[in-house]
Curated annotation (Swiss-Prot):
GO terms for molecular function: GTP binding; GTPase activity; guanosine tetraphosphate binding; translation elongation factor activity. This is Elongation factor Tu. It is found in: Cytoplasm. NCBIfam families: EF-Tu (TIGR00485), PRK00049.1 (NF000766), PRK12735.1 (NF009372), PRK12736.1 (NF009373), small_GTP (TIGR00231). The gene is tufA. It comes from Haemophilus influenzae (strain ATCC 51907 / DSM 11121 / KW20 / Rd).
Amino acid sequence: MSKEKFERTKPHVNVGTIGHVDHGKTTLTAAITTVLAKHYGGAARAFDQIDNAPEEKARGITINTSHVEYDTPTRHYAHVDCPGHADYVKNMITGAAQMDGAILVVAATDGPMPQTREHILLGRQVGVPYIIVFLNKCDMVDDEELLELVEMEVRELLSQYDFPGDDTPIVRGSALQALNGVAEWEEKILELANHLDTYIPEPERAIDQPFLLPIEDVFSISGRGTVVTGRVERGIIRTGDEVEIVGIKDTAKTTVTGVEMFRKLLDEGRAGENIGALLRGTKREEIERGQVLAKPGSITPHTDFESEVYVLSKDEGGRHTPFFKGYRPQFYFRTTDVTGTIELPEGVEMVMPGDNIKMTVSLIHPIAMDQGLRFAIREGGRTVGAGVVAKIIK
């Protein structure tokens, strides 16, 4: 049998391990790369290679994250693993590693623990769409009833946060034994990989989503009209398309009469490209940075929302002091700052640098937003926090 040719055309899916400290997330990550490399080709990554996670910066925040890659016969996966709990919190809130699905690792010897709950809650808040459970260390539990009990607890916990607990795939395994090459436990890793392939749907590519362009600049070109520039966030824009200008002011409709890149006229602009769009009959002063051009009806402007926020610590260049309710910083969405006020959860009086917190925000101008939109919190141009829109209120 000839060796299967490596195809770059395989669908690309982003996943990651989440769960309580010491439940075996990193060991599982190593086991997946090792077992899949053995069965389907690819590179194995050793535990200590993954555990010594390099530092990276996302929105000015230092996060330790390890990225590994592996293949199943039908897909290519990029997988993120974080060494510390704080790194997970930052990672999920900043969207540094956007996950199409997560593998929740729960040690069968412990059952669900505080961080298990917190990671599920964060997953819900930041929009991780699918969770698969790996019940780890099952080689250390010989009581079938105990395993069933832990499984039931995990399902209840998932349901509590609006994940389909009853239908969630749960694999009983032992990451360490699989890593050590014990066949019956290697099987469990293949079973997990199969669930990744079948339970997590193929993510919709940015180019297939409705058109959206955050406006960075506005120019007036004599005799031709108004041009807005920016990087297409998603979708495709073609000459002749009708678009809406959304955010800050009342939503307005216009038509794109030309798309250009590097001063050359194009038929279309696609997700990821920096373009200029010429707008028919729109005056220079009717548009400003911070608005978006979007497919009509695809996105709406809002001022009030619930969010999950990480507040930078002093060492990360954040505030040195706590803030209280009524705090009025700037919220930076896509290309612009908008002032807003915050409300803290009941019983919370103040927020310390380094905390993560759920807060309700009220902006002074509406911004085009949907659930899952990331933002930074700034004071005088300095980033002091990162957040994600968890739920739109109005």
